[in-house]
Every structure is written in structure tokens, then in C-alpha cells.
């Protein structure tokens, strides 16, 4: 007999979760730790037990028995027998292969003799094997540590790396108890938990992996806490120059590090010190006309004896940096991100080269504890003007989205929303520059996009923080690692197709906790029954998984409600 529980687990690994069930929220919080959200229409959300989601759960300490027990406790029907077997087989593969370091040799150990034979005979593994070390072990070439882990995860045997790390040159760093502005400072409880999960008491079981925390939850501070524990010279990789300088400001504000110890390596400066902060862009730069293999700034990885490398917004790590990271497996590596989702599907490379997920905290849990602002999400659907419909329907697939996303009917809505929030600091976010230029002119508001000089960006961000600017129009350059704590309203007029990570990052711009505990409001404007609406639903997946709900409005209903409110 069926029980009144929210989940139905199918034999193909699909989990159907009923939203209106009283136990939906607790089931969602449990399931999201070991399954991926696939789609989220109004009443039934669909999850899937993926191999990588189960391996990440295993790396966080979950056992197959715990996952089966959690699923069973929320499942309306008994779990299919093949799913029980799948969970056990998948999770039990984590740790079958291990890398260790013994007597000056890198050793690959495999606890299953048949899998070991498969590895021995693999054409991909053969170039990396020095010689056999025993029935269950191989000596691996020293430079192949990262490549071997990449190969093994593709073969279906994620490798637990216990080979240890180069300590790096020492760094005398400690976190401050009072900031430079005289404010008290300490790590929050969950920040300590994240730091300690990564460090694992300094053992070989720690020292590499990814910390997943919402935007606004202080991932930079977690990174600084790890730096203090490691106590070694550190290279920090960030998304852009603005983020780079925010890292430097935070380090100088909240630690004993001085300006001569923290250096910027960017297009403007090429300085290297005990702590050096750079960008993915500068590392992936190569001169036109040179070999695709030549990246002149890769030598930064050898300029110092780094004991720790921090990858900020690790979900954005570009392919060339993956390549150099494969050679850096003897260095401790910390990835920081709000979401492990990568639109290029290379989550397994993050797992094998940076490390598995070490800590994850649901967004709604931190919201309930007032560490991040509560947020209300709205999707407002607008119609096409008649003169745009033919252009849309005869366009190619890519142009269809651009035409729908830049629908001019969105402009009066943007203005109406801003009038609705007269006291708030507001970000207008979009993908298409001509659309943003029109909105900036309409609102008489400043705009930041890719061509805006870094000095101008920083000046405008600072004026926004100080309240001199109330509305700021920004392109995707502001998606990541921009600290605008007073921003409380975001209006998204267009996005990068169906990018789930972008939606999460854009909401994150307004999640910094507010002085009086005020909530944040996120609007996304979409053209009804078009690619714009279709991609919007894909973008919302990650946030839906985190517990956010979108109120759906018809544009005229939204405007009428606002008019009625003004007439009262």
C-alpha cells in the first residue's frame, strides 16, 4: 500500500518529488545531497541519481546505506531493487583506487584484482605506468598524478588521492579579531565547519576539494581561514580584476598580512609575493599567432613554492587552467563556488583535479539562520509586439532567443519595478549590450560592461556601495565575485541562454545580509511562449533545488496591481 510520502523512485534512477506534500521541504533537503535536479514544473520536481552526485556524496562521508535509508524514508513505494544495487555499486567504487606516496614513489593501489587488471591493460593508462609494485599496486610516473585521476574517473573508478602534498614555503598569517575599521571579526560556525572539512586535521585525507556555499555567505573568508591553517605561501585565482582587488582588500582588512606580502598579478601589474592574486583571464592569455600550447603566464605557478592554490568560482575554471592544474597535484588545492554546475559538463574534471566536494550548505538553511538575506523571486511574462512576431518565427534558433530576450515590451516593466522600489539599491542585469544601453539611457543610469575600464568599474561600484548611485545597469561582467552588500533588488532582462550557474550568481548579487534584516527581490523578465521562457525555466533549476520559488506574473497583472497599490 502506498504511503503519503513525497518521493517516488523509479527504476531508471529518476526521483519524482511532490511539491505539495507536507514533507516536501525535508525530503528536498535530503535528496539534493546525493541527486541532481533535472526539471521543476509547478507540482512535481524531477531528480536523477547520477554517478557523480553519488560520488560527491561519498566524498562528503555519506555511505550507500545512509543514502538508501534517506530515500526509503521519503519514498511512497519500496525502492526498486536495481536502484539499491546501483547506489551501492556506485558509491562503493569511491576509494577502490587510491594514490599514495611511499619510498619516493607515487603508488596506485586497487583493492579489486579484476579492476586492477583492467587498469594495467588500459591503453590510456599505459604511458603513465612506471612498473608494477605488487599484485594490487603500480608505480605511477611522478608527473602523471593528475592525468591518472582524470583517466580513472572516466573509467568509472574515482581515485582517492592520499599521496600528500608539498608543504610550500611558510606564511606567517593569522586572522584578525578586529578589522581595520575597528569592527569585530571571527569565522561564522558554518565557515569554521567548511574550513575544517577541507583541512581534515592536516591529514592526507584533506587538502584538496571544493567548498560549496551561497553567494553572500563569505566564501572568501573561508578561503582565508584555510590559508591560516595551511600556513604556506598562497596563489589565488579569481574571475576578474575587480574580484582580485576585493580579495586583496579582504586579506588586508581581516588578517595580519601587510601590503608588501599581498601582490596583484594582472594586466596592470605583474607583481609576485608570498600571497599573489591573479585572474583566470591573465593565465589563459596567449599572443595571437603563437602556438595554442604557449601560455606565457603559466610560469606564475612556478614563481614561488606555493603551499596552497585557491580557485575562486571554480565552476568557471577555463580549459587551459585545468591543463596546468593536472601538473599541480602536489600542491594543496581549494575550490570555492556557489554551484558545482558547469555548463560545459566538466564537473568530473573539477572532481578529479581540484578535488571532491568537501562541504555543502543549503541556501535556505543559511537564510533561516539570517546569514544571507531572504529572497523573493518573480518571473514576469510579457507579450511580443505584433511587429516582432514574424521576425521571431522565421529566425534561426540562436537568433530566436536574442529577439525574444530583447523584447522592447520589457522596458516599461523595468521602469515600473524601479518605481515600485524607491528606497532600494537596484541592479539591472542583462546579456545584450544594445538592450542594456537602451535601458541605461531610459533610466539615466550608469552602465558597466566588458569594455568599461577597471578603474571606472571600481569607481561606479564604490558609488553604488555609498548610495550615490541607486540604480546600476550591468552586463554579465558583474555576475561573479562583485561585493555589493546593499543591493537588494535585481532585475534580469536577459541571460546566457539556459545557464543555471548564472541565475544562481545573479541572485547572489543581492543576498548579502541587510542591516535591518530586509529581504531581497529578484525579478526575471521573459517573453511568453518563446525560447526566452524556455531558457528561463532551465536557468531556474538550481535555485529551485535550493528551495526558492518563483511567483509567475502576467505583465499586465503585475502593472495593474502596482497601479491599484498607488491609488490606495
Language model features by range: what are they?
Residues 203-226:
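Walker A/P-loop
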Residues 340, 497-519:
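Conserved SF2 helicase motif VI
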Residues 308, 315-378, 543:
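Post-DEXD/H (motif II) to motif III coupling segment of the RecA-like Helicase ATP-binding lobe
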Residues 509-539:
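Conserved segment of the helicase C-terminal RecA-like domain
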Residues 262-264, 427, 434-438, 444-479:
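Conserved helicase ATPase core of P-loop NTP-dependent helicases/translocases
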Residues 394-431, 437-438:
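Conserved interdomain hinge at the start of the Helicase C-terminal
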